[in-house]
Amino acid sequence: MNAHEVNFDGLVGPTHNYGGLSYGNVASQSNSQALSNPKEAAKQGLAKMKALMELGFKQGVLAPQARPDTAALRSLGFSGSDEEVIRRAAKEAMPLLAACSSASSMWTANAATVSPSADTADGRVHFTAANLNCKFHRSIEHPTTSRVLAAMFNDERHFAHHAALPAVSQFGDEGAANHTRFCKDYGDAGVEFFVFGRSAFDSRFPAPQRYPARQTLEACQAVARLHGLSEAGVVYAQQNPAVIDQGVFHNDVISVGNGEVLFHHEDAFLDTEKVLAELHDKLGRRGGRFRAICVPREQVAVEDAVKSYLFNSQLLSKADGSMLLVVPEECRNNPRVWNYLERLTGDDGPIREVKVFDLKQSMQNGGGPACLRLRVALKEQELAAVNPGVIMTAGLYDTLVAWVDRHYRDRLGEADLADPQLLQECRTALDELTQILKLGSVYSFQLD
């Protein structure tokens, strides 16, 4: 049966700013307090969506969160009208206002973990919103994420939605940024690959010393159970703690997989040979031929991988059977990385083409092409059941660019977050967006 991988990219929200909120994310920390350009950021993301759509890939849109989140601020003791809440927070606790104004939901690889129907016990596509409990500014996302996903995938015959895991450190879950899937064809049963940074309950697993490991083994196992995955179709691997301490805060900063191919750095995992052997064996039993492309540290150091976001790329299957690697401009600007990519595409391997995108606004906050998208493999009848308002078309692209032009600012600094007018601008924009994308009422300000 025909099936497609659809990339649902996060639409950058109107409060996109450089708050430096993500400890362990080198780019986020190093660009803290710089002036951002929300309008440019949103258009850069939309340009990538349009370009991939025009290349023949299925492309969708995931709406941003409503920010500033005044409900979160109220839960922290700020009272009065929404405007007074913002004013008080700006005066008394600016870091909290910055956190509650973050546009980090643009990185939809962290929105949820998705298992296609070919892998699940009940034959439906399963979604579990990520609790993102390692960072306060992201931990407040999942209630809205769940409502948005339910509005996009709203046919219970085809789609099952699970609430986020318990919001405690033992079940820290960062979603699809630590998950990929291997398969012969998108509609076939595949092998789901869960990567964790530490175990909450088993001290035999090592842990990083400098930066936190955001994903636990126990969270991965819980999601696999919720989705009804069989043991024959799951592989768990531990990310190398040493690379977490070098700024690899999610596995999609050090590896990317698609189809039968895993593109990874030599230092990405612990027990690499054992992990690759299990993937090879389990995918082979499901009719596939697993292939790993290992990037040696002598050719690309971990530091270069983090700076360029070589692995935070999209690996896409083309109609001719070859693969396209979508990378940020920073890869072309790094001589060692670019030399490697030129050699890679010159080999007789599956990755034959590299396409470069300017995503500087997102990159400066620590998110590349892979961060910006949530992959959902859908059979034809499942794709037909998706809310059509969120599927990218030439017309929707034009509508969204015009919407951005009407509502977004072209510069935003920390002081601007204290402007109560920003809240009204954002709510007006998002109220209109839910009509454009045919989502109904998904934001708290629409439900109150």
UniProtKB/Swiss-Prot annotation:
Q: Cite the Pfam families for this sequence.
A: AstB (PF04996)
Q: Which InterPro entries match?
A: AstB_sf, SuccinylArg_d-Hdrlase_AstB
Q: What is its EC number?
A: 3.5.3.23
Alphabetically, the GO molecular function entries are:
N-succinylarginine dihydrolase activity
Q: In which pathway does it act?
A: Amino-acid degradation; L-arginine degradation via AST pathway; L-glutamate and succinate from L-arginine: step 2/5
The positions annotated for binding substrate are 19-28, 110, 137-138, 214, 252, 365
Enzyme class, UniProt record, top EC level: hydrolase
Reaction equation(s) it catalyzes: N(2)-succinyl-L-arginine + 2 H2O + 2 H(+) = N(2)-succinyl-L-ornithine + 2 NH4(+) + CO2
Q: Which Gene3D superfamilies match?
A: Succinylarginine dihydrolase (3.75.10.20)
Give the keywords, sorted: Arginine metabolism, Hydrolase
Which sites are catalytic? 174, 250, 371
Q: How does it assemble?
A: Homodimer.
Its family remark reads:
Belongs to the succinylarginine dihydrolase family.
Entry function:
Catalyzes the hydrolysis of N(2)-succinylarginine into N(2)-succinylornithine, ammonia and CO(2).
Q: Can you name this protein?
A: N-succinylarginine dihydrolase
Which source organism?
Pseudomonas paraeruginosa (strain DSM 24068 / PA7)
Name of encoding gene? astB
